[in-house]
Amino acid sequence: MNIQVKPGATSPHVKTQSLVCGTLVTTDLKRARRMYEEVLDMECVEPEQGLMYVREKGHQQGQAKHGKPYWVLEVRETPEVAVPQEMLNHWGFEAPSQAAVDEAFAKVSANKADYGITRVQKPFFRNGSYAIYMTDKDSNWWEVEYRTPDLIYTALREKGDQFQD
């Protein structure tokens, strides 16, 4: 089904300010937290039983946010994962270089059993990035990628639409 965009439409139906969160599930918050903090270098807080918020490190109350957009993952503990995820439904992290992706692959591969990581794919080039993908015991997929400056998302967005039906 193709949705036609009305020419001249200037006002969205829903007026939002920013994307603030995404949600995923785990069967074990403690295991997930350890992986998020020790493998992915994220900051975690559990405001109530069965709920954890995860974000990049570096933000203190009253300070400018570390990066924009700045959002969190909302992680819910559930007895089982009802809908296992596929690789295309992944959470991505930016690496500073291709060498950093290679280093991540080596370290994660060597320690995957300690963190409940069930699979780590060898680094490869895809869609202009160099990346590894890994999955945890909850079937959540994680990507660590490096993009050249002309292929970072801000540069791609500045180019605008490159494909039209």
Where are the language model's segments positioned?
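Exposed loop/turn and edge beta-strand positions of beta-sandwich/beta-sheet ligand-binding modules
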Residues: 48, 87, 128
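Helix-adjacent hinge/juxtasegments
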Residues: 76-95, 99-100
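Vicinal oxygen chelate
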Residues: 27-30, 91-138
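Short beta->alpha transition motifs characteristic of CBS
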Residues: 77, 125-127, 133, 144-151
